[in-house]
Amino acid sequence: MTEEPHAIEITLDRLLLERHMTLAELAERVGVAYPNLSILKNNRARAVRFSTLTRLCEALECQPGDLLRLRER
């Protein structure tokens, strides 16, 4: 049985661009490994911890809704 992909997208690339910040800078600020943030940025993550989401929002000065969006199916 194959699992259907989720419909949540991470808009990290847009937020980084708007804030003139690199993924490496964000990784350092939030204390998450660069490869893990890359997986998240490229929408390959299957889950995100609330603690990680909180740190991302704090570093990017945004709300969770700014980072997540529902993809149209």
Q: Across the structure, where does each feature detected by a protein language model lie?
A:
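Short C-terminal boundary/hinge segments that cap the last helix of small helical domains
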Residues: 61-73
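DNA major-groove recognition helix of helix-turn-helix
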Residues: 41, 52, 71
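Alpha-helical residues within the helix-turn-helix
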Residues: 17, 28, 58
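Short, basic-rich loop-to-helix N-cap that marks the start of a DNA-contacting helix
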Residues: 44-55
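A short, Lys/Arg-rich alpha-helix, primarily the initiator
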Residues: 1-21
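Short alpha-helical DNA-recognition segment
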Residues: 21-39
